[in-house]
Amino acid sequence: MKLIVKVFPEITIKSPPVRKRFIRQLAKNIRTVLRDLDPELAVTGVWDNLEVETAVEKPRLLREMIERLCCTPGIAHFLEVHEYPLGDLDDILEKCKRHYAGQLPGKIFAVRCKRAGRHPFTSMEVERYVGGCLRQQCGAAGVSLSAPEVEVRMEIRDQRLFVVHRQHDSIGGYPLGALEQTLVLMSGGFDSTVAAFQTMRRGLMTHFCFFNLGGRAHELGVMEVAHYLWQKYGSSQRVLFVSVPFEEVVGEILGKVDNSQMGVILKRMMLRAATRVAERLKIDALVTGEAISQVSSQTLPNLSVIDSATDMLVLRPLIASHKQDIIDTATRIGTAEFARHMPEYCGVISVNPTTRARRDRIDYEERQFDMAILERALERAHLVPIDRVIDELGEEICVEEVREALAGQIVLDIRHPEAVEDGPLELPGIEVRALPFYALNNRFKELDSNRQYLLYCDKGVMSRLHAHHLLSEGHANVRVYRPA
């Protein structure tokens, strides 16, 4: 299979040195993202597009390659093409007929030709000649340049002809690794996951920072969604997952701060801590999922007071977004189900939270706060590469993996229902039940405790996370199913 990758249009208007650097970075990222599917993958080209060529023929692997490229920052879209040596107009016609003749009978069509290099014909001459012949020879109903039912597309580059088979849209943005780094404050809900996606999509390397307010299940859930975002949209670069224990900070706020000011002061403490983490990692900016007036702490006066806790740039990609638009984006990128079923721990609840915080009042309340507690939280912050979050769950609990399911065991397919529908797990003689990851923790206690359950997912990441959580809750009848 051969692909022609079209880069994000904003890359093409950069100066030549910057443009080349960005495209080289994109080529490197593509190799990294696809190398486990094809170690011999070839990625060439350095100027306006890239050519990707693979000898892989298995449909499942090809579909996975296409899916990954559709989620790779820096790519506007890419074309599946058939390549031929360039001949004369009659030869071009024959190659187009080979791929499009079966699609044209009774259809309105158009021919689109893009050309680069020196040739004895123009792009328009190719379109007119090929279009006229196809209409006569293939039973087409007619030609429409403005509203065709079928587009016959080709690209001519020097002495090569590419007949386009299919186009796939990607997410645009700049290649990860070409721009600066950010640290996103993650709660695992709709807002923070979409904010993280927005910065990753734009091309900013995005590290994850979670403030643990006291819930182990919440921490595991945020680990899971952070790993999902990285694996789907950012796996070309290694980033960190940072967990900061904030239980003592919450306790100090509850005991020392006036009820109405708690929410704003908690956010200020988080920004202070995140700033210290970012400075330690030489990260350039913080990212939050706040939107104007979505909750009481997000009014303009409150955001201004919150931001005064740090000198670091705070990016808010969702600042003018409507909640439904955020939810729709989360659904599209695959984080909505994580967010809907994210375990929560709310340790700071203001009965009458202020919507117009005053700096002098906040300063007074913070003078009651023992800042040594914040320092202790930072000393206990745990940093781990995002691809190793599973290994860092704790050595005290061993998650057993099995390669084969035995009679009497039940395999729980915890993948998203759409993934189950696209590729159902079938094991002869073994009972397989679909139980989505987002419902597993609540519904597992309803299952027969005398049976053995094997958790299954495509990568083994979610299954290990949930097996670890269930084992830590005392369910000893859980293992992970990882077929060879």
Swiss-Prot record:
Q: What class of enzyme is it?
A: transferase
Q: Which GO terms describe its molecular function?
A: ATP binding; CCA tRNA nucleotidyltransferase activity; tRNA binding; tRNA-uracil-4 sulfurtransferase activity
Keywords linked to the UniProt accession: ATP-binding, Cytoplasm, Disulfide bond, Nucleotide-binding, Redox-active center, RNA-binding, Thiamine biosynthesis, Transferase, tRNA-binding
What would be one Pfam family of this protein? Rhodanese
List the CDD domains hit by this protein, alphabetically.
PPase_ThiI, RHOD, THUMP_ThiI
What are the THUMP domain coordinates in residue numbering?
Answer: 63-167
Protein name as annotated: tRNA sulfurtransferase
What organism does the record attribute this protein to?
A: Azotobacter vinelandii (strain DJ / ATCC BAA-1303)
